[in-house]
Every structure is written in structure tokens, then in C-alpha cells.
Amino acid sequence: MSDINEKSNFVFEFQPVTKLFEEQVRLHPDKCAVASSKESFTYAQLNERANRIANSLIEKGVGCEKIVGVVLERCCDFYAVRQGILKAGGAFAVAAPDYPDDRVQFIFEDAGVPFIITTKEIAKDRQELFSRLSCTVLLLEELLENPNAGNPDTRIKEHDLCYCIYTSGSTGKPKGVMIEHINLANFVNPNPKNAETYGYVSRGSVSLSMA
């Protein structure tokens, strides 16, 4: 097998996905980073929005091992929010906005989230649900108003928590699976031979798109 397979001298060295992303921002600031049917952001635009979110969260005390809940439709800012949480040093747990109230409540209470990020529209639609939760609801529109759009100086270690994903709960209560930064960094391995593609299509549930 070793004779058949192409050998590579590539050696994996850990870098958190936040730094890998910032490197792409430096290399390709004006290239499209994310696009939907309604809008698109370049790497520079996505990074700026993520930084405003990150700096807002840091000011509120988000840091290492703090899980932040996310309830958003699939949109370009969904990726800005995830990146912003990671840039703040936190981790994220996502619940799709069409999930039943009981499931959303279980996920966020089980994960112990201090904050949930959502939009004004979703907050209005799910007002009854959010009123039952003990965490603070943060509106995306307000987080994006933070004047500090610079990259946060956050140190992320290999085994810091990156995100928490929940099973369907079809055989009982949903179970949270903790994913560390080393796992995600290895998945998006920066070996150029593994990155020769323009991008990918994300069509699954927002709560499963990192699985």
C-alpha cells in the first residue's frame, strides 16, 4: 500500500480555525467567503462582522469553555456568529429556529449557556420560549454595532472546547457531544492538497452543519 499511495511530507501543526480563517482573510480579503440566495460576504466583510460579535462577547465575559447558544436561520451571518464566538474564546451550541420549545430549552439548559444569540425577528416569534430560559438573549443586530472590528487577541489551546452538538434524541433525550478545537482543526487540515476547492454547499440543518 505504501508503494501505491502518494507520500506526503506534510506535518500537521495545530492552529485554531480562527487563525486559519484570519490567514485566508489576509490572503484573499476580496474573495467571496460565504454566499446565500440573498447576500454574500467577502473574507474581509465576514471577518469584520465576526470581530464585532467577538469583541461584544468578550466585553460580556465570554471566554474559554463558555458555551454560547445560537438560534438563527441559515444565512451569511450564521457563519459570522459562529466565528465570532470562537474568536472570543468561547464555544457554541446551535438550535434550529424551527425546533420545538422543549428541545431548545433542554439543549441550552443542559449545555449551561449564559447567552443566546438570535435576531430581533426570532426573539419576537419565540418570546415565550426565551422568557422561560435563565440565560440572557443577545440580539445579533446589536452585537454588530460594536465599534471594535479588530481581531481579538485570544489564545486558543488544542483541547479547548469548540462546539457542542446534540443528537436527535430519537431514542430518548438528546445527548451533547463536545468537540475540541484540535478536532475541528484536524478536519480543516491546512494541507494545500486537501484544500484545492472553491468551497462547499451546506444544505443540512444549521444545528448539524458542523457534524
Regions found by a protein language model. Name each.
Residues 1-185, 195-197:
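Carrier-protein-dependent adenylate-forming modules in NRPS/ANL systems
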Residues 66, 202-203:
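Residue-level recognition of the N-termini of beta-strands and the immediately preceding loop/turn
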Residues 190-194, 198-200:
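Low-complexity basic/metal-binding stretches
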Residues 204-211:
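Short, intrinsically disordered, charge-balanced linker/junction segments flanking boundaries
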